[in-house]
Amino acid sequence: MNNIAPVITIDGPSGSGKGTVAGILAKRLGWNLLDSGALYRLLAFAAHNHGVDLTNEELLKKLAAHLDVQFIAATDGQLQRIILEGDEVSDVIRTESVGSGASQVAALPAVREALLQRQRAFQEAPGLVADGRDMGTVVFPNAPLKIFLTASAEERARRRYLQLKGKVEGVSLSSLLDEIRARDERDTQRAVAPLKPAADAIQLDSTELSIDQVLERIMSEIAIRDIAG
């Protein structure tokens, strides 16, 4: 791991906007991007495809260590593309059912350990923007800037509904809200690396903020710390 490259971590619950913010921020800075949540979603999706039970920690650990994954950076007018075993899965892994599976496998210590070094390997020059749930508390505890981004469950469900509407059949706002609340409980109550802000994190509630307003706050913190040079 390159200890020189700076890291900005953006943690928060599902639907808080951290992925969107992290992607735009990484592109603006010209830095690398780690979407750690995608790794857990990919593992849950791969487990389903291979018939691996989400409670089988040993098999999940082996699957995590050998995931055939490719991240293709976003370009103008296009979102980041994610390839699993040769197939593009960028949209399908964003469904709440896959997200629920990701939350289950993320609670398993052996799985988290298997993916830890894989995540840390993303820390390369000129810098890294890492988004997830334990980026600032576990994966990059020495990051010079840590953001914890949240929003009300209702607002997060609304955002996810707009994101999935037209892409996923049968999606409803009420079911998304129920799933988000259930996932919040799992993520905050798990024994290993529970979702919580780092002690030195800047906490931002984005319920009433636009993406641009959130980015403006973060860019101000970057300037104060002179992180990007």
From Swiss-Prot:
Enzyme Commission number: 2.7.4.25
Any GO BP annotation: nucleobase-containing small molecule interconversion
Sites where the protein binds ATP: 12-20
Compartmental location: Cytoplasm
Xref: Pfam families: Cytidylate_kin (PF02224)
Alphabetic keyword roster: ATP-binding, Cytoplasm, Kinase, Nucleotide-binding, Transferase
CDD domains linked to this entry: CMPK
Main subcellular location of this protein, as a coarse class: cytoplasm
GO cellular component assignments: cytosol
Keyword check for Kinase: yes
Transmembrane segments: none
Family the UniProt entry places it in: Belongs to the cytidylate kinase family. Type 1 subfamily.
Name this protein carries in UniProt: Cytidylate kinase
Organism per entry: Pseudomonas fluorescens (strain Pf0-1)
